C-alpha cells in the first residue's frame, strides 16, 4: 500500500518556489537584481503598497504622478508595483518597445471591476434613448478603470482624471458639453461636482444592474452629472461617525480624507485630496499638529512613522484599519521573481493592451496630461 508520495520541488525559476521563501530572504535578492538591471528598468510603487515592497521603488506616488513618470521614462522595463489598471495605463502611455510588468496579475481593483465595457456601452445607449444627444454628454472616467473604459471615453471626446486633477477635468468637460457621465466612482464624482457648486439634486446615480440605470428618462435629461454606481471598497468603509468619534476624543485634531470617501464624510472633514495632497497637508502642518487620515492604512502608517520625530501625530480615521487587499497581493517574493526573471531575459506578467484599445485610451490619457497645467 502506498502511504506517501514524493512531492516534486518547484522549479527554482517558478513563482511557487519564490512564494515558498521567507520575506527576509528577498531583500538582498531584490536589491542585487535591481542594481544589475540598472537604467534598463524602472520600479514604480503606489503609495498603498506594503513597506516591504515600496521601499525598493525608484519612484512612489499616486496614480497621476506614476502615470506621468511612465509616459516619460526611457527605461525598457517598467515594473509597476500597483494594480492592473495602473499597469495598463503605463503600457498605453509607454513606447512600443517598452515592457510593463505587474508582479502579481491578481492585483486588480474592485472599483475598476464595477464598470465593464458592455455595461458602459449599454448605459450610453440608454442616455441616447432618453433623448440626450451624444454631443451633450461628456464621458469622463477616473484612472481606476480598465483600458477599455478609457478608450470608450477617448473615442467619444472624453478623458481620464485622477483624484488630483478631477476638478480640472470636470472644468474641461463642462467647457465642451452640458453634462458629464462620470465613471466608475460615484463618490469622487459627487465630491468634485459639489465642490464646483453643483447641487446634489443635479446629480443622479446610474446603476448598471437596473433597467435604465434605475433612473427615469426625465431625470437623466435634467441631471448635470450622471454618476456611475461604483466605489472604492477601502474608502467607502469610512463613515461620518468615525469623524465625530475622533473629534470627541482628540481636541483640535485635523481630519483629512481622500475624495473617494462618501460625501457625508468629506463634508465633515477639514480637508480632502489625493494621496499626494494628503502627504502635502502633513508636510506643511506645524509641529504638534495631530491628524486623523481617511485613506489606505499602509500610507497612514508610513506617514505616522515618518512624521513622529517631527512632532506630528497621525492616526487612521477608522481604527479597525482599512487595507487595500489587492495592492497587498504584491509581495517581496513576487517582486524578486519578476526582477530575477528579467535578469535571465524572461519577461513575466507583461501587461499588453491591444492596439485598437490603446489608441483611444491614449487619446483620453493624453487629454488628462495636457489639462494638468
Swiss-Prot record:
Taxonomic lineage: Bacteria, Pseudomonadati, Acidobacteriota, Terriglobia, Terriglobales
UniProt-listed Pfam families: NadA (PF02445)
Top-level taxon of the source organism: Bacteria
Name by which UniProt lists this protein: Quinolinate synthase
Annotated organism of origin: Acidobacterium capsulatum (strain ATCC 51196 / DSM 11244 / BCRC 80197 / JCM 7670 / NBRC 15755 / NCIMB 13165 / 161)
Annotated localization: Cytoplasm
Residues involved in [4Fe-4S] cluster binding: 109, 232, 324
Gene name of the encoded protein: nadA
EC number: 2.5.1.72
Gene Ontology annotations for the cellular component aspect, listed alphabetically: cytosol
TM regions (residue ranges): none
Iron found in the keyword field: yes
